Amino acid sequence: MDFTNYKAHELKDLISKKEVSVEEVTKAHLENVKNIDAKVNAFLYIAEEEALNDAKALDEKLSKGEDIGLLGGAPLGIKDNISVKNMQNTCASKILEGYISPYDATVSESVKSQGGVILGKLNMDEFAMGSSTENSAYKITRNPWDLDRVPGGSSGGSAAAVASKEVPLALGTDTGGSVRQPASFCGIVGLKPTYGRVSRSGVVAYGSTLDQVGTLGRDVKDCALLTQVISGVDHRDFTTANINVPNYENSLSENIKGKKIALPKEFFKDGLDPKVQKSIYDALEVFKANGAEITEVSLPLADYAISAYYLLACAEASSNLARFDGVRYGHRSESVEDAVDVYFKSRSEAFGKEVKKRIMLGTYALSAGYYDAYYKKALKVRNLIKGEFENIFKDFDAIISPTAPTPAYKIGEKTENALEMYLGDIYTVPVNIAGIPAISLPCGVADGLPVGLQIMGNYFKEDTLFNLAYSYEQSTKWHEMHPNL
């Protein structure tokens, strides 16, 4: 019995029935990591000893008849910008090389308390700045569907690990599409919750008003299960909302009769791969057959989302990343004359090219004389975009679009063309600007590569997204596709 072929909810059932132990499941996945990860490069740190100790402790609890929580012994991986006690937390950057977190992020704490077994930390674009996981200071993660292609980013390690069956579940972060776009490229399910639904405490900040921890799994049920575990108010993060978290498993119904879905015409213009467009239109027919009503709408300001996003995200990054100074941990320059030198030289040597570029852009946008012209204007555009979404959700339950304009591209193909790389997030960025939830799920194949469908919902309506996504998933077979490694 190969336990790596099972989804997390299936493993949970097998473990609860005592048909298999948590330790056996953990060992099987660790073995798969050892066999596969040299090809995929999803992991930055493998926590073999910690994982086996945690698995044995959970088996001990089960032997005493104790409940081990919602995850019930399922293994998972954590993106390397989310703190896990006594594990590295490098953000895939040299400036945090060797840094070991002394505490758990709230989401890591939640995962552990609900019986999740953390197998290690996953690769990412440095400080979550990128869409391909080529910006990691340590290694380039490869797409399990084609090892010459990118897995997406910045949570590329998370998506690749799930798609290659190294883990059934993973946590990532999503600032402008960093969970959904890799999910699309790797043919899995990825959810970015509403801003404020999940705690950011213990997560290294990139854009504090845009960042949100998201979940990745091989089907909608797994994604819903992990989202249930990490959602809720947290006194350590004042931006979390004290709004009831529904039982997401109850929303996994195939019935979507009467659901109203909006289709923004601006998301189906030039730049969208015709094969991706066909997959989305084919998916719409499934939603119609299942009883949903689909209407074309207009989101004219969505065209300005990328511009506003890069101003806001970079401005926030320039402030957030000022704390990495080479003094207390991580890389410290050796060719220094004084304390000021430590700060400037350590940062210059240790930050990667993309991170430096975004810090400089953000500092420029916040500087005297440019604040009103750029940053303040971007805030105004953000409010207008939020208003457009709010107006649509007065009449509709959800909005559907592609997740990305193309399938996964070749490693190195877009590294010299920043604009083309940034435009890859054209459908995902508006979601973060508005703070709404969105899910990506597989809906087709283009040239042998997965295509993702994005469903956007109203604030704190993740249950509606799970309902729509589950209905589609159960009517199709795309979630059963797997790469052949």
From Swiss-Prot:
Keyword Nucleotide-binding: yes
Protein name: Glutamyl-tRNA(Gln) amidotransferase subunit A
Entry keywords, A to Z: ATP-binding, Ligase, Nucleotide-binding, Protein biosynthesis
Protein function: Allows the formation of correctly charged Gln-tRNA(Gln) through the transamidation of misacylated Glu-tRNA(Gln) in organisms which lack glutaminyl-tRNA synthetase. The reaction takes place in the presence of glutamine and ATP through an activated gamma-phospho-Glu-tRNA(Gln).
GO molecular function: ATP binding; glutaminyl-tRNA synthase (glutamine-hydrolyzing) activity
One of the Pfam families matching this protein, by short name: Amidase
Description of how the protein assembles with itself and partners: Heterotrimer of A, B and C subunits.
Annotated active site: K79 (charge relay system), S154 (charge relay system), S178 (acyl-ester intermediate)
GO CC, alphabetical: glutamyl-tRNA(Gln) amidotransferase complex
InterPro entries: Amidase, Amidase_CS, Amidase_dom, AS_sf, GatA
Family assignment from sequence similarity: Belongs to the amidase family. GatA subfamily.
HAMAP family: GatA
An individual GO BP term: translation
Its EC number(s): 6.3.5.7
Catalytic activities: L-glutamyl-tRNA(Gln) + L-glutamine + ATP + H2O = L-glutaminyl-tRNA(Gln) + L-glutamate + ADP + phosphate + H(+)
